[in-house]
């Protein structure tokens, strides 16, 4: 167990009193460069794995606890030039690895609606800051559900756009083929306003969708939508209140004139193990850069060799969950286990193709297979239950760390497919809408009606 110093949080006295949930790592006041933009008058808090030239960028890790970025992430400059004021950096699971905001060097985040419950992760601080009304909106990152799950637990909206819609330049990577900048807000209106500002091509990010691809994506609105309900999401583990809210949301959209039909996406059943195989492999590669020699926390211990110093720095600088995922990822990439990685990539390709074939609109990057079950959007729960208490989460995690991984079972399919998804609060429970690759506006259109 690493020693955690709560005094390391970089907060002014006023914010420290206001932040009852430990949702912030640092508070800032960075005025916008343009005070008359479309986001004029708004304030936001950004997840602390996104680079800002003001203050620290820690990824909630000891190994980066004193790191100051010399540049802003692209999204920070976009928000500033469009009128929004940055007022803080939010707490998170270290390097985005976790589903409860438990794995932070700066201590756990609590849920504003019930401080005995987890806020979800890894963007728990971002969700808690919105639920606690500390800002107009917050920015998080979503790798396997890290915006949608905390939004569900904290009873706010959490939007993961299509992969490549928003620039990742300046985002500290966990798994770069999955990491997506997401937006958390109290309503769809503010999320749409922020999304319109950030939905721009950035030549500094090679995964950002180029203009010629964006122009091929349909932009027409449909009055009557067909909503698919995959039976693979009808899990026996769903709690009664989650089922009830899901049924309520489906009945509501029927009353609005939309159609609902059952569908099947068989590869969803293989999504969770595929996700953790790929994500940990990418994490092992991405986090190999942190040696604490050039920047970051250094133990400054007297050792016999540079390699020994790096090993000491990494052992002391990374938390237990990050170390676990690095080990899992290195094993996956080893010669003895390479077949698992290849199989996971195949499953991901199959899932992308199956999702693509189910939607009415075509996928701009894939050739769609034919399906008789065409729908416009998909609706499913965001999580299998409401937020667990801290005692329940810790007890389950101590019995088997894999229990916390299962929390992502309903969110990782959209992440693997790279499709847009939003968690909408329905009677205090998150209900998830998913759309075709690039159909972000259609997802937001229906989310605003629920």
From Swiss-Prot:
GO biological process: glutaminyl-tRNAGln biosynthesis via transamidation; mitochondrial translation
Primary subcellular site in the record, as a coarse category: mitochondrion
PROSITE patterns: AMIDASES (PS00571)
GO molecular function, one term: glutaminyl-tRNA synthase (glutamine-hydrolyzing) activity
UniProt keyword Transmembrane helix, yes or no: no
Keyword Heme recorded: no
E.C. number(s) listed in UniProt: 6.3.5.7
Catalytic activity: L-glutamyl-tRNA(Gln) + L-glutamine + ATP + H2O = L-glutaminyl-tRNA(Gln) + L-glutamate + ADP + phosphate + H(+)
Keyword field: ATP-binding, Ligase, Mitochondrion, Nucleotide-binding, Protein biosynthesis
InterPro entries: Amidase, Amidase_CS, Amidase_dom, AS_sf, GatA
Cell compartment(s), UniProt: Mitochondrion
Enzyme class, first EC level, given as a word: ligase
GO CC terms of this entry: glutamyl-tRNA(Gln) amidotransferase complex; mitochondrion
Pfam family, one: Amidase
Active site per the UniProt annotation: 47, 122, 146
PANTHER family reported for this sequence: GLUTAMYL-TRNA(GLN) AMIDOTRANSFERASE SUBUNIT A, MITOCHONDRIAL, TRANSAMIDASE
Subunit annotation: Subunit of the heterotrimeric GatFAB amidotransferase (AdT) complex, composed of A, B and F subunits.
Family: Belongs to the amidase family. GatA subfamily.
Purpose of the protein: Allows the formation of correctly charged Gln-tRNA(Gln) through the transamidation of misacylated Glu-tRNA(Gln) in the mitochondria. The reaction takes place in the presence of glutamine and ATP through an activated gamma-phospho-Glu-tRNA(Gln).
Protein name per the record: Glutamyl-tRNA(Gln) amidotransferase subunit A, mitochondrial
Organism name: Candida albicans (strain WO-1)
Designated gene of the protein: HER2
């Amino acid at each position: 167990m690493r020693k955690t110093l709560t005094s390391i949080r970089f907060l002014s006295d006023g914010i420290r009193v206001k932040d009852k949930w430990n949702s912030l790592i640092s508070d800032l006041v960075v005025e916008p460069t343009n005070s008359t933009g479309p986001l004029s008058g708004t304030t936001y808090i950004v997840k602390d794995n996104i680079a800002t030239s003001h203050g620290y960028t820690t990824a909630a890790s000891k190994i980066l606890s004193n790191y100051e970025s010399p540049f802003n992430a692209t999204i920070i400059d976009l928000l500033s030039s469009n009128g929004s004021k940055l007022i803080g950096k939010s707490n998170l699971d270290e390097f985005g690895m976790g589903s409860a905001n438990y794995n932070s060097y700066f201590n756990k985040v609590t849920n504003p609606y019930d401080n005995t419950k987890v806020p979800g992760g890894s963007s728990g601080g971002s969700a808690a800051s919105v639920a606690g009304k500390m800002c107009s909106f917050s920015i998080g990152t979503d790798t396997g559900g890290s915006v949608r799950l905390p939004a569900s637990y904290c009873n706010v909206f959490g939007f993961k756009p299509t992969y490549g819609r928003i620039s990742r330049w300046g985002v500290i990577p966990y798994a770069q083929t999955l990491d997506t900048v997401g937006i958390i807000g109290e309503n769809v209106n503010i999320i749409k306003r922020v999304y319109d500002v950030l939905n721009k091509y950035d030549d500094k990010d090679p995964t950002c969708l180029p203009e010629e691809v964006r122009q091929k994506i349909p932009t027409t609105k449909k009055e009557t939508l067909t909503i698919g309900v995959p039976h693979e999401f009808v899990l026996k583990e769903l709690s009664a209140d989650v089922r009830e809210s899901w049924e309520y949301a489906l009945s509501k959209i029927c009353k609005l004139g939309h159609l609902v039909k059952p569908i099947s996406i068989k590869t969803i059943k293989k999504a969770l193990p595929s996700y953790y195989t790929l994500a940990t492999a990418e994490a092992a590669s991405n986090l190999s850069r942190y040696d604490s020699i050039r920047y970051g926390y250094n133990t400054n211990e007297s050792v016999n060799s540079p390699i020994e110093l790096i090993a000491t720095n990494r052992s002391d600088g990374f938390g237990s969950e990050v170390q676990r995922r690095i080990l899992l990822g290195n094993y996956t990439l080893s010669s003895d286990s390479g077949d698992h990685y290849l199989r996971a990539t195949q499953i991901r390709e199959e899932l992308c193709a199956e999702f693509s074939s189910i939607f009415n609109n075509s996928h701009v990057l894939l050739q769609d297979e034919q399906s008789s079950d065409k729908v416009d959007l998909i609706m499913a729960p965001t999580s299998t239950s409401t937020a667990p208490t801290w005692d329940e989460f810790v007890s389950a995690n101590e019995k088997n760390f894999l229990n916390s991984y299962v929390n992502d079972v309903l969110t990782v399919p959209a992440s693997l497919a790279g499709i847009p998804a939003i968690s909408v609060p329905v009677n205090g429970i998150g209900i998830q809408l998913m759309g075709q690759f690039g159909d972000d506006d259609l997802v937001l259109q229906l989310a605003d009606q629920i």
